[in-house]
Regions:
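Short secondary-structure transition/capping segments
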Residues: 79-94, 131, 191, 205-212, ...
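N-terminal anchoring/stem segment of glycosyltransferases
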Residues: 1-62, 77, 135-139, 155-158, ...
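GT-A fold catalytic core of metal-dependent nucleotide-sugar glycosyltransferases
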Residues: 58-113
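Glycogenin-like
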Residues: 8-9, 91-195
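Conserved beta-strand scaffold positions in the cores of enzyme catalytic domains, especially
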Residues: 35-37, 82, 181-184
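A generic secondary-structure signal marking the coil-to-beta-strand transition
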Residues: 2, 81, 102-104, 124, ...
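Alpha-helical context
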Residues: 4, 46-50, 67, 120, ...
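Residue-level signal for well-ordered alpha-helical scaffold segments within enzymatic catalytic domains
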Residues: 26, 30, 68-72, 76, ...
Length: 262
């Protein structure tokens, strides 16, 4: 099966994100996947009215743009399967393979955050689209494209949540239709990133108690990583430190025990 990996990022991007992109390119070569990188042409197929309504909410525009590009590539027979990975996804275990058994799959994350108004942490499981893969003739792909546009037409432009057309929609649908999930492609919250960059603690312990298999790639969640520190330079340093730690886990990451090397 011919597989193509699709990514996109702004021309001006931080060095830590460039490391993520490089990890995906290297992994794609190891897995013998084709690789395509898009710049501003990512939004080529997105209707003008949709972009206008998104305004500055680029993640919402990207949620539709990636699907339209994947649909186009599949129509052109560029591949039998097209995989999208967000620019802030780090692949640190080279043996990761993404091959949907059904016609599509999405990622799954265990998101650790502080309890509101309480001490300690809580963890929530969510479907995410930092990874998405579709095969030829997938009926879900055109359905999602249609649903997202219908939702946008009805939405109040002043109240469009960043995850409205991505994780929130997919998690809601998953509860009904049970998507195939790639749990090996997870996500790390700011609380997890902080402990990866410094010392494992309660957040990592809670995360580890919930995971069902080793994480082989992680969405570093650029939109929330700014919570790591007040200064951009400190945020960048923490992300580089976390990336260094994850890259040392070539067999996968399941928690603090993965960080103890013989």
């Amino acid at each position: 099966m011919k597989t193509l990996v699709l990514q996109s990022a702004a021309d001006q991007r931080p060095e830590w994100m460039q490391r993520c992109l490089a990890s995906v390119q290297s992994w794609a070569a190891i897995a013998h996947y084709e690789y395509l990188f898009l710049g501003d042409d990512l939004f080529e197929f997105v209707p003008a009215w949709y972009l206008d309504k998104c305004g500055e909410k680029l993640p919402v525009a990207t949620d539709l743009a990636r699907l339209l590009w994947m649909q186009q590539l599949l129509r052109e027979k560029a591949a039998d399967c097209v995989i999208w990975l967000d620019a802030d996804v780090l692949v640190f275990a080279p043996h990761l393979r993404i091959a949907p058994r059904t016609t599509c799959l999405f990622g799954y994350e265990y998101w650790v955050q502080r309890k509101r108004g309480k001490t300690g942490f809580e963890v929530r499981g969510n479907v995410h689209n930092a990874v998405a893969a579709f095969r030829q003739d997938c009926p879900i792909l055109p359905f999602l494209i249609e649903v997202i546009q219908r939702l946008m037409r009805r939405a109040d432009s002043q109240h469009i949540a960043p995850q409205m057309m991505g994780p929130k929609l997919l998690s809601h649908l998953h509860n009904t239709v049970d998507f195939e999930l790639a749990r090996a492609v997870g996500a790390v919250s700011p609380e997890m990133l902080r402990e990866l960059a410094d010392t494992p603690g309660d957040a990592m312990q809670l995360w580890s108690s919930r995971v069902q298999e080793p994480m082989l790639a992680a969405n570093l969640a650029a939109s929330t990583a700014v919570e790591l520190a007040a200064e951009p330079a400190a945020v960048e340093a923490s992300l580089h430190a976390a990336i260094d730690v994850l890259l040392s886990c070539a067999d996968g990451f399941i928690g603090a025990e993965s960080l103890v090397k013989p």
